Amino acid sequence: MAEMHPLLARARERARYSQDDVGAALGVSRAMVSYWEAGSRSPNDRQLASLARLYGVELSDLLEGRDAEPVGIDLTGMLLRADNAVGPESAPGLQEFVQFLERYAELSGLTKMPIRGMTQSPYVYRSKFSQKDDARRKAEEVRAHLGLGAGPISDTDTVCEMLGITIYRAPLGGDLRKAPSGAFLNHPSVGFSILVNLDMTPGRRRFTVAHEIAHALFHSSEERWVISHGRGPREDFADEFAGEFLMPSEGVRRFMEEVGMPPRITEDVDVIHIQRYFRVSFPTALVRLKQMNAITAATYHELRREVRPVALARSLGYRIDPEEYQQDAERWRIRRFPRAFLRMLRQAVVGEVMSPPSAAAFSGLSIADVVQILGQPLAGTDEPEGTEVEFAEYEDSGVVPRA
């Protein structure tokens, strides 16, 4: 048994867990994990089996002191144990998330295309020394780093790519009293990765992306994984960050002033214009304006109860996304994957590393989906191209000479 103790430390370090992580997973103190690794105490049989699963090694290797490579870290189990209040209906989505990350790492090796994932945050945040305006200042800091200023964010997926954060979407359950809105995981091979609950409304999903970015950038030094469920200081910070990141106070007030809105809003059309400008949902905009004291509590409840935001936005000339009326899971068959993964999958087929059927089996997509990723028209369809007409318009107007 004496030879096992140094092996415990090496297996933990290879799996990129801290002693705090292991203690939290097994329900023991960090000091106890340290005693195990130092050899002053020994884990019991149940704890040893849990350590083997956690580190992704065979139990027999630990018992016999063999320094074997991990065979598969139980990341799904870690996510499920991170919040005991999460219902069992969320387990398949969490497992799908972890399995996707493993396939992503495998595909990177097959295609020789690196995953440019962040593994350590450049941002400093110490929760023990938090101030009231920390979330606002941190959101401003990240926006400044990305060159976003105080204006709207057109695409949160692009923001994740710029930060080196992998984003994946999977169904976790629609009842947020039992289901998480999302999760963060610092994956051993992929790096910072976030999961968004696909069962939520489009507006809530967008908010969750910003919320999980907060966990990745500001809580990853303390936690390797976070399940976004329930309340607490960490969740409160991530919520405040998300609101400020999507609708910065400075940007909202500047927009209101530039278009001639009063400092205290009472009209439903003003909320619609703010919502559409910042590309968030009506509930997100209304909640954010209430947080900023730009509307009173009475106005908030009145607009929440009486406004039909999609119909009103349409009457004001705004383009309406079909999902604003009804969610459509079919639209997310391909879009649930990060773009970098889709680029790799396409390269695997183009480079003849995989055939279309094998790429479909590998990714869980249909062959028709893979054909679509390749940029080819689907069989039996005639997809009109408007690009030739547009090129002719540039040439006819003299913007560029004809070839």
For the regions a protein language model found, what residue spans apply to each?
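Short juxta-domain linker segments that transition from a proline/glycine-rich
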Residues: M1-A403
